[in-house]
Regions:
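P-loop NTP-binding site
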Residues: 4-167
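Internal gly/pro-rich beta-alpha loop/helix module
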Residues: 1
């Protein structure tokens, strides 16, 4: 059954999983958004529109994203964690921001079935559209967009990459 298959599935020492993952592009970005007028806005709408912009960019290019996560913080302890596990799925929220804010710190992490350059462009386009719609200033602190196989060749394992991301 499906449940039995899930219980027996492991990504460790699973060559089929490793081969599939090696074809994906890894994307990471850290950024800061703030309103240009200093007013507070619905930051959940900003996150939603950003993810929808990414989804539409992938659909236009006939690509997909098995893993897209955003983590956004604003104010004291207020945060949002959203996930998209494919362009045909709804956005899932582990947490949404409780109130409007004037600024937002965000991490975008994705593994996508898309070549690196088109993925980077569509991410930039989605962010530009959100900034224009909500009149936001954006400061990007870090962007990484590369095929996972390239990361492996460079000696960066997924665990190393995740630990670097946490720093």
């Amino acid at each position: 059954t499906h449940e039995t298959a899930l219980k027996n599935f492991s990504v460790r020492h699973n060559q089929e999983f490793a081969d599939a993952e090696a074809k994906l592009t890894w994307y990471n970005r850290r950024l800061y958004l703030k309103t240009n007028d200093g007013g507070k806005i619905d930051c959940n709408a900003v996150v939603d529109d950003l993810i929808e912009g990414i989804r539409m960019g992938l659909i236009e290019r006939k690509r997909n994203v098995p893993h897209l996560k955003t983590f956004a913080t604003a104010g004291e302890g207020d945060y949002s964690k959203a996930s998209l596990i494919g362009v045909d799925y709804d956005i899932e929220y582990a947490q949404q921001l409780a109130e409007p804010h004037e600024n937002l710190r965000m991490i975008i992490n994705a593994r996508a079935v898309c070549e690196a350059r088109p993925l980077a462009r569509l991410m930039d386009d989605a962010l530009d559209e959100v900034c224009e719609k909500y009149d936001l200033d954006c400061q990007v602190f870090f962007t990484e967009c590369a095929p996972i196989c390239f990361r492996m060749m460079m000696g960066i394992s997924r665990l190393q990459a995740l630990s670097q991301q946490a720093l």
